[in-house]
Amino acid sequence: MSQEFKISKELASLIDNVVKKFPSNRKRSAVIESLLILQHDNHGYVTKDIIKALSNYLSVSEIDIYEVATFYTMINVAPVGKNVIAVCNNVSCMLRGSDEILTHIEQKLKIKVGESTSDNKFYLKDEIECLAACNGGPMMQIN
């Protein structure tokens, strides 16, 4: 049986600094940045227990926080390797060879998209739509 996740005083202080940026009735505006803080503290991903703790802390529904966590690609809801590799799969990058780069990475690291290497050093992230540098594509991001 796992223990319930509790937000530490240090993490609460960081989250409080985020919350202060917004009107008092807009705590939900702090969800993305708060998830990133908690993710950083939890080896690169958030769990259901973390989402529940943040829900209680911000008084925002769990489902609202879960929807944010699963919508934004920079938030991981499953364990990932130490270094996260993301290859853009948008049209401009695809036309310039992102598929070939992705295939090369898969072969070199012996993993598929959505997997980590056996030593947990690398995780190949899935579905990155745009890294906002289309003129320099194909683009990829590490960490």
Where are these regions (language model features)?
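Signature of N-terminal electron-transfer/Fe-S-associated modules in redox systems
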Residues: M1-N143
